[in-house]
């Protein structure tokens, strides 16, 4: 499937020693905009046809790239960063089973999935 967005997740310890995280959208598909808070509020949408357990790559992007600089960086504080890449929605295995076996899944069963890929973290230490 095509890509919806690329995110950078920053983690750090606050003054009380509690872990914190912040998500930054760094690249988004389909001409959507990233707001001043570092997030894109517009969803990519979905082309999933649950009845046929299919989708089309008519939304999203085949590739995304970006240059990003942490707007909250403080050289005196440790942090970690990792990248998360999110695909457009596609049929979940339950949709394929429903079609193949001619059954009806209960309404509470998810029929789509949005797959994600994660990188290993990069650790910053002020020492």
Write out the residue ranges for each language-model feature.
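C-terminal functional module detector
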Residues: 1-127
């Amino acid at each position: 499937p095509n890509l919806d967005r690329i995110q950078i997740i920053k983690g750090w310890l606050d003054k009380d020693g509690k872990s914190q995280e912040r998500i930054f959208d760094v690249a988004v598909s389909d001409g959507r905009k990233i707001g001043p808070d570092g997030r894109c509020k517009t969803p990519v949408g979905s082309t999933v046809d649950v009845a046929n357990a299919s989708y089309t790559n008519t939304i999203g992007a085949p590739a995304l790239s970006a240059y990003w600089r942490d707007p909250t960086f403080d050289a005196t504080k440790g942090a970690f960063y990792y990248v998360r890449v999110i695909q457009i929605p596609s049929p979940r295995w339950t949709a394929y089973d429903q079609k193949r076996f001619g059954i009806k899944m209960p309404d509470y069963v998810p029929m789509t999935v949005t797959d994600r890929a994660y990188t290993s973290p990069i650790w910053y230490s002020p020492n």
